[in-house]
């Protein structure tokens, strides 16, 4: 079956920004041809890209909604697959897992607030995934909008080379359109059409000098990336528009430059040129290097080129529960084709699975298709897959690199209200924790039997509980949020574990001696087999490691997991008859417990990176409050009459901070908080936490 859209007419893009910079509104404004789509307003709770009830109520994006739309440029029809991602830090996993499947990203910046914290964090992720970018300075119609200030912030804060290919025609309530520095024409949107139509005019006299100045800057910046053009430029030869565009595209794909455009998505101004820039400057799927993975049968590295004739290979980047279709698995096809109803091989799980219906998505509406090909994105009904799984041709197996997600930093106890709720809850938590959201986990406390849910922040858990009620009709009682403490050690120690059990028949014998030492913070766990002379047979070495890991999960001081430890197994003994896997597991566990209590164990707590934006009048009160929360002020930055206070604060001290900040700043302050690192809890506080924890376990 021939593909509907040629691969060279396909673009896969993400829309990423800080919360409230206008991502969803921008996506809503991207028009489609052949479909009558009603434009929704985020401010009215009607945006179609924000389709979950919680998103409509809060005016923020929680999940990464996908939409396929079409754009015609110079008579050629293109398909643009767009992923609109959350700006709230509690849902940044949606941004990260989208990065792997995108060919380019449009970063939205507010012309008023400029470069904000979550944008910086997401920019670093884009660097890691080597994704080309375009910057769109939005909200040019707002009071305080300043294109030139934000352009400078992009250059300084993100340490990249931006190149303005437009400058604004007016600002704030005088914002009319943009000046195209390539064509040296002004584009003015007609208010009477609500921005649906525009006119191309000569640059007004009052803007000609600034336009010429910025065009020169644009040309200089672009030619610096191309030796041939630089030579022509230095020799004062004419550089054609086609040469400039070609060089800009190459520099964008190679991540040497970031084109900068501007507009007001809310007023529907600037979106059409943004789409043109996506078509002209972003890479085609066939421009990208082959994806690399591992053949599970041979262990050797293999690659797949973005061609339909290559063996099928796709990456599951998102899994969602749909109330009507069941599980939806969103995939990006890197090579080959997949037909509806055919079988695929889930190489990650070593399972053959049937792909039912294939759906082209527009937020929460959908269009059924019969085939998906290289470079395309779709949702598949019927697969039992999880985020990060590789789907492929069974005869040509490959496993692509899986994403690593941060551990949750906050937990909360939940209790079903009725027996009926109890029965449904385990099924829902299994889907949410294992497949749908890799940063959300559900566990059962082995001592109390309580169900604990774990996530990236208060809002994250609040949304999950709300979804249980709305989508599955499950009512739960919710406990207070709890901090995900951890434990570690400060010094080296040696420990011995010996497990001997004599019964009437065969006994049990395991004996292990280990040395433990602290690792740098965040390094996790290392196990070194340093056994010589066969004092412990090789088949029992993994048993010792398993026992050590089990003991680490149960903690030293208060039952919290132990992290950042190196364990060296260097001695022990065994019995020809009585030694067994379980005996050496117990020996390993006992050895770790023996060593750990001598290694100066300490309690660790999550430290959050907090950024508070407040009017100048309240800075003193804000800093005083952060200090009272054991915070360390890391710096301050002025943005007009707004001051940004940056601090490191223990998560345990940040519960309920939103209410306090509203009170301190008369509702005018805002803050963002994200995980930074783990650090030691001060001794007097640690003693209290340990005491309360142990009292809870004994009661």
Swiss-Prot record:
Primary localisation category: cytoplasm
Binding residues for GTP: 17-24, 84-88, 138-141
Protein name: Elongation factor G
Gene that specifies this protein: fusA
Organism from which the protein derives: Aquifex pyrophilus
Gene3D superfamilies to which the protein is assigned, alphabetical: 3.30.230.10, 3.30.70.240, Elongation Factor G (Translational Gtpase), domain 3 (3.30.70.870), P-loop containing nucleotide triphosphate hydrolases (3.40.50.300), Translation factors (2.40.30.10)
GO biological process: ribosome disassembly
Key words of the record: Cytoplasm, Elongation factor, GTP-binding, Nucleotide-binding, Protein biosynthesis
Origin: domain of life: Bacteria
PANTHER family, alphabetized: RIBOSOME-RELEASING FACTOR 2, MITOCHONDRIAL, TRANSLATION ELONGATION FACTOR G-RELATED
